Amino acid sequence: TQAFLADDIVPFDGAHQAGIDTPGQAHLNIIAFTLRAGTTIDDVRRLMTVWTEDARQLTRGHNPIGSLEPELATIPANLTITCGFGPRFFDIIGKTDQRPEWLKPIPVFSKDKLEDAWGEADLALQICCDDPLTLAFATRHMTRAGGKMLETRWMQQGFLNARGATDPGTTPRNLFGQKDGTVNPQSTAEYDDYVWI
């Protein structure tokens, strides 16, 4: 018999990137990258083409080109792969006029003790899934697919309750026991006002 959640797919293609208004999956990796010196806009186009097609295949439970472990690509389990750009990205590709006005360094608050090692990056991937093995495989594959253009700056892992452990739509608790995400956008109108650009 088929395992619960194994074949569940979040469509990769749509009006917006999957993984933003998607119900939270149980496991998360956020990987931040810097573009290596000498990377050109043509290099970035190639990277985005490769990442887009590989993410599309992985989220469908298919093996992407260049995969080293095809047997690990078969359980999509709500896998989403979402890409974001940092402020410096637009400088590097020579498109500063396309950088959103609000995309700037995060302000420092008086109590912050921020470390540069965990700071902003040129690109980030948010990879979420209900299966930790699929998540690990997708993370490794997408990082490897970045090739010589990228240097991994940092990675953070996160988690929520397993699917079915709480009622759908329940606001999760963080490790301090506090409800986390209570005021996140919920409705289409809120997403239109605060999220989509």
PLM segments and residue spans:
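Long, histidine/aromatic-enriched segments associated with O2/redox biology
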Residues: 2-197
